[in-house]
């Protein structure tokens, strides 16, 4: 089957931003103007196409990354609309991993918000080229050039306007395109009647000034263009487009556009810019992976290369399990068998679909560069690689942050017990930041996630989708433990009970691992002192012991264990004996490695009238907060601080009373840090008292 669109005419893009910048509305307009939907859906009416879960439509926020295909100017555009709420940061993370380009949407009034910085960092982590759409130009207080400057200052990006608004706030009537040097005037409310016109006289000087700056900025990044610019003093429209595209692909330039998606102004020009400036799959670096022999290899974006794809999202719905994949190379056909190289398991591809939000179009194959979904995969979870059985490779996976908050959950009736475990299994398969565990002391089921809203939505889904009635406990902070020094540990398990005994013996070296590594295991056994078949069980025993640390029973993270020695018995040794010996050695070593308690630190930004600045800072300091920055602009103060999550419960109520209801704040996870000794002692003694 031939391709619908050649690879150079495919764009895999994400639309990302902070809450309320208007991402979903922008996506809706893109779908309307490109012909996917024939009626405009509004977020506040609960009718947006990409907000397809019941909770999204009720709350007017996007929770999951919905993938949609559309076309514009003979190009296939695959769009992922990502959530702006920090509790759903994994959705942004997983979409950034599989995209080739991003439209970052900013509010023309609010400008750069804390969540914008998070999204920008995530795009940086995966080196995703991007462009900016400054939305909501129709709102009171909209200031296009001020937002452009904020992007330069706060995000350290070489942002450059390639458009200017004609009028602002209620008088937004059109847009000047600095590249084509033309004005586009909107003649009807639907944004379908657009007049191409000369630039209005009163804006000619401003447009000329910005166009000259744009030509200079573009020429600086390209030797060929700088010669033309120095020789002729200007660049043609085609030369400008070529230069902007090169700048975007090399991460040297971020073009900034403007408009109002809600008022139907500027969206078609955004689509034009996606086609003109954002990369095709063949414009970005080939995906890297590791071969079975441990060597690195790359897979080019080519239908003729061996098949490889990354599963970036798993979803359960009434029709079964849906696994979203990004095709990196080769062709995936319906009915074929493939290899999950991450889990070393064979999978059958029963059906393939391309999605238009909650509508599906069945296809016979997916090709390099496509975003699609597979039905019928049994063992594949988020971050797994799918590939040819003859050409195995494991692709780079996703960065998955540690959860920061947990609650106990128990079924209301015995009949709900089985339904609860099925629901929790399905939800944790979908969302790697959602963890399920059992509290050893109370035997309660504990669920952990990225924030209160995250857990609230998941509990809501249990009720709606799985019909589980459950009681939920009060939120608890997800502490962690780690080690600060190195040591040796030894575990010898020897039991003689009548006939056959049990014998396992291991010696390990323990040291702190890099942050984010979790549990790292290295085997340095030589001469067969521990046979190969017992190394896995010994490692598993240590890994399981990590789940409950030595200080207060919290999971132990960022620990490197090297197996250096041991002994075995020809008759009495078994996998179970070595698993127990591994656990004993781990416990022995940890106690000597200066274990410490870690707590989640949150990046908090508070906005309030500047009269309350002193009270806000004083209150944050009393919560063990470290103020990292503050500014006052137009009578509004902004304070950035890092505060332990444990101190932030009930903060919204306190802030309201402190600022007479005029203060707002945003909060997102920053990192784990060591708990001060006096606070740690109280937490440890409380936990030991409960055990």
UniProtKB/Swiss-Prot annotation:
It is found in: Cytoplasm. One of its GO terms (cellular component) is cytoplasm. It comes from the Bacteria. One of its GO terms (biological process) is ribosome disassembly. GTP binds at residues 17-24, 81-85, 135-138. Keywords: Cytoplasm, Elongation factor, GTP-binding, Nucleotide-binding, Protein biosynthesis. GO terms for molecular function: GTP binding; GTPase activity; translation elongation factor activity. Its main location: cytoplasm. The keyword DNA repair does not apply. Residues 8-282 form the tr-type G domain. Catalyzes the GTP-dependent ribosomal translocation step during translation elongation. During this step, the ribosome changes from the pre-translocational (PRE) to the post-translocational (POST) state as the newly formed A-site-bound peptidyl-tRNA and P-site-bound deacylated tRNA move to the P and E sites, respectively. Catalyzes the coordinated movement of the two tRNA molecules, the mRNA and conformational changes in the ribosome. PANTHER family: RIBOSOME-RELEASING FACTOR 2, MITOCHONDRIAL, TRANSLATION ELONGATION FACTOR G-RELATED. Belongs to the TRAFAC class translation factor GTPase superfamily. Classic translation factor GTPase family. EF-G/EF-2 subfamily. This is Elongation factor G. It comes from Prochlorococcus marinus subsp. pastoris (strain CCMP1986 / NIES-2087 / MED4). The lineage of its organism: Bacteria, Bacillati, Cyanobacteriota, Cyanophyceae, Synechococcales. The gene is fusA.
């Amino acid at each position: 089957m031939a391709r619908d669109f050649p690879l150079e005419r495919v764009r895999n893009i994400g639309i990302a931003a902070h809450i309320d910048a208007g991402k979903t509305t922008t996506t809706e307009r893109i779908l309307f103007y490109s012909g996917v939907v024939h009626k405009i859906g509004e977020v506040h009416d609960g009718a947006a196409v990409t907000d397809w879960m019941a909770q999204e439509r009720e709350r007017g926020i996007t929770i999951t990354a919905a993938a949609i295909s559309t076309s514009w100017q003979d190009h296939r555009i695959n769009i992922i609309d990502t959530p702006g709420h920090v509790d759903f940061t994994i959705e942004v993370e997983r979409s950034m991993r599989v995209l080739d380009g991003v439209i970052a949407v900013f509010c023309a009034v609010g400008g750069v918000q804390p969540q914008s910085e998070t999204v920008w960092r995530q795009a940086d982590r995966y080196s995703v080229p991007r462009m900016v759409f400054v939305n909501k130009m129709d709102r009171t207080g909209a200031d296009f050039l001020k937002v452009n400057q904020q992007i330069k200052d706060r995000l350290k990006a070489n942002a450059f306007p390639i458009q200017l608004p004609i009028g602002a706030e209620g008088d937004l009537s059109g847009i000047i395109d600095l590249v084509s040097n033309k004005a586009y005037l909107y003649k009807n409310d639907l944004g379908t009647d657009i007049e191409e016109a000369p630039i209005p006289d009163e804006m000619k000087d401003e447009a000329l000034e910005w166009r000259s700056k744009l030509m200079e900025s573009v020429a600086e990044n390209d030797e060929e263009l700088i010669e033309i610019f120095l020789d002729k003093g200007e660049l043609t429209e085609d030369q400008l487009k070529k230069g902007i595209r090169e700048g975007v692909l090399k991460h040297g330039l971020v073009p900034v556009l403007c408009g109002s998606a809600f008022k139907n102004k500027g969206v078609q020009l955004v689509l034009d810019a996606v086609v003109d400036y954002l990369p095709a799959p063949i414009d970005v670096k080939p995906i890297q992976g590791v071969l079975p022999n441990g060597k690195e290899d790359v897979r080019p974006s080519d239908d003729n290369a061996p098949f490889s794809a990354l599963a970036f999202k798993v979803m359960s719905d009434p029709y079964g399990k849906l696994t979203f994949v990004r095709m990196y190379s080769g062709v995936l056909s319906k009915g074929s068998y493939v290899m999950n190289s991450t889990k070393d398991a064979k999978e059958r591809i029963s059906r393939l679909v391309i999605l238009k939000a909650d509508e599906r179009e069945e296809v016979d194959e997916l090709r390099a560069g496509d975003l699609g979904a597979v039905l019928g995969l049994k063992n594949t979870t988020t971050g797994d690689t799918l590939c040819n059985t003859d050409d195995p490779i494991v692709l780079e996976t996703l960065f998955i942050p540690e959860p920061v908050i947990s609650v106990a959950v128990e079924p209301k009736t015995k009949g709900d017990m089985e339904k609860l475990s099925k629901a929790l299994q399905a939800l944790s398969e979908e969302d790697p930041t959602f963890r399920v565990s059992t509290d050893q002391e109370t035997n309660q089921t504990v669920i952990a996630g990225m924030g209160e809203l995250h857990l609230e939505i998941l509990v809501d889904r249990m009720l709606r989708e799985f019909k589980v009635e459950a009681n939920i406990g009060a939120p608890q902070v997800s502490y962690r433990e780690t080690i600060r020094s190195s040591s040796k540990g030894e575990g010898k398990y020897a039991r003689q009970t009548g006939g056959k005994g049990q014998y396992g013996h291991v010696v390990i070296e323990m040291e702190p691992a890099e942050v984010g590594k979790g549990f790292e295991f290295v085997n340095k056994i030589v001469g067969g002192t521990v046979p190969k078949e017992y190394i896995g069980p010994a490692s598993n025993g240590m890994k399981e012991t990590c789940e409950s640390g030595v200080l207060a029973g919290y999971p132990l993270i960022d620990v490197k264990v090297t197996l250096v020695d041991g002994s075995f018995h020809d008759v009495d040794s078994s996998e179970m004996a070595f698993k127990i010996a591994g656990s004993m050695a781990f416990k022995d070593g940890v106690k000597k490695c200066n274990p410490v308690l870690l707590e989640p630190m949150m990046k908090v930004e508070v906005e309030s009238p500047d009269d309350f600045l002193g009270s806000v800072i004083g209150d944050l300091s009393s919560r063990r907060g470290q103020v990292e920055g503050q500014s006052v602009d137009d009578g509004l103060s902004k304070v950035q601080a890092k505060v332990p999550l444990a101190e932030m419960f009930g903060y919204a109520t306190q802030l309201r009373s402190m600022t007479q209801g005029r203060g707002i704040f945003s909060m997102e996870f920053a990192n784990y840090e060591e708990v001060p000794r006096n606070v740690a002692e109280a937490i440890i003694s409380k936990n030991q008292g409960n055990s």
